Curated annotation (Swiss-Prot):
Alphabetized PANTHER family for the sequence: ACETYL-COENZYME A CARBOXYLASE CARBOXYL TRANSFERASE SUBUNIT ALPHA, ACETYL-COENZYME A CARBOXYLASE CARBOXYL TRANSFERASE SUBUNIT ALPHA, CHLOROPLASTIC
One GO CC term on file: acetyl-CoA carboxylase complex
Molecular function GO terms recorded: acetyl-CoA carboxylase activity; ATP binding; carboxyl- or carbamoyltransferase activity
Subunit description: Acetyl-CoA carboxylase is a heterohexamer composed of biotin carboxyl carrier protein (AccB), biotin carboxylase (AccC) and two subunits each of ACCase subunit alpha (AccA) and ACCase subunit beta (AccD).
Pfam families: ACCA
UniProt entry keywords in alphabetical sequence: ATP-binding, Cytoplasm, Fatty acid biosynthesis, Fatty acid metabolism, Lipid biosynthesis, Lipid metabolism, Nucleotide-binding, Transferase
Descriptive protein name: Acetyl-coenzyme A carboxylase carboxyl transferase subunit alpha
Recorded name of the encoding gene: accA
NCBIfam families per UniProt: accA, AccA_sub, PRK05724.1
């Protein structure tokens, strides 16, 4: 089956066997109902075992799944009256980042996120979700607009990282990212950031200075990809699985380290299995977070955000 992952093979093989038996059961005189029921019970146990014992590498594969829902997928289900806004008012429009104004349960908000493509043509248009400087500057323009008009900001993070090409560097890639971090830290409105897939390095951080940060259960957040880390540490990108297990990139890891504020449960097998159900889980988290943050004053929001990031990376020697 296309786009299925290595760790799911036992599940897929059993599902295929059940499907074959059901088809045979409908066309033959032999009653295989009992056998099918036994296999379905076995399948339920197998799925529970596999999906509750996923490794960091397994989750990394799910986070990169080609059919994983994107920012625009979630926007269509979570927000009303979304109006996309374009351009950074300096160089151009970057399709790797989408954003605009909308309402969330009647509350005017600004929503921004990385956008990967759905197929080869779309990925080329979206630059595989890797923003150029104009993408980050577009995001900042929308954030400043939200700050001016008192609209909460909701960011969806899903990128391998900022685009590392020559043109991007010439247009000030590092400055654009740094400027977002600087400006976001001083915004007077609630900022909620949600890692929905892959949170890669500075490209993710540029939308990640939130009052609260959440991750989907199978999302990852890291300074470098496992392949990149393996190439640096062991001179062998083939050691990516080993690197993933060492890097602490999963939602559980980031929550334990105090970097994120919560984990959003995923539907069994990953968000791509049921977009509507997954959007409903995200809706619950945004609703609860907005309710809490909108009770804060402007000064409290800025202080809370400052204190949150001030604590990250603090350690003590035992």
């Amino acid at each position: 089956m296309a786009n299925e992952m290595e760790f799911e093979k036992p599940i897929l093989e059993l599902k295929s066997k059940i499907a074959d038996l059901k088809e045979y059961n409908e066309t033959s005189d032999v009653d295989l109902t009992n056998e099918i029921e036994k296999l379905e019970k076995r399948l339920a146990k197998l799925e529970a075992s596999v999906y509750s014992n996923m490794t960091a590498w397994d989750k990394f594969q799910v986070a990169r799944h080609p059919e994983r829902p994107t920012t625009l997928d979630y926007i269509s289900l979570l927000f009303e009256d979304f109006m996309e806004l374009h351009g950074d008012r300096a160089f151009g429009d970057d399709a790797a980042i989408v954003g605009g104004v909308a309402t969330f349960n009647g509350i005017p908000v600004t929503v921004i996120g990385h956008q990967r493509g759905k197929d080869t043509k779309d990925n080329l248009h979206r630059n595989f979700g890797m923003p150029h400087p104009e993408g980050f500057r577009k995001a900042l323009r929308l954030m400043k607009q939200a700050d001016k008009f008192g609209r909460p900001i909701i960011c969806f993070i899903d990128t391998k990282g900022a685009y590392p090409g020559r043109a991007a560097e010439e247009r000030g890639q590092s400055e654009a990212i740094a400027r977002n971090l600087y400006e976001m830290s001083d915004m007077k409105v609630p900022i909620i950031s949600i890692v929905i897939g892959e949170g890669g390095s500075g490209g993710a951080l540029a939308l990640g200075v939130g009052n609260q940060i959440f991750m989907l259960e199978n999302a990852v957040f890291s300074v470098i990809s496992p392949e990149g880390a393996a190439a640096i540490l062991w001179k062998d990108a083939g050691q990516a699985k080993k690197a993933a297990e060492s890097m602490r990139i999963t939602a559980d890891d980031l929550f334990e380290l105090g970097i994120t504020d919560g984990i959003i449960p995923e539907v069994k097998g990953g968000a791509h299995r049921d977009l509507t159900a997954q959007a409903a889980e995200i809706n619950k988290t945004i609703t609860k977070s907005l309710h809490a943050l909108m009770a804060f004053s402007e000064e409290q929001l800025m202080n809370q955000r400052y204190e949150k990031f001030k604590k990250i990376g603090v350690y003590e020697i035992l």
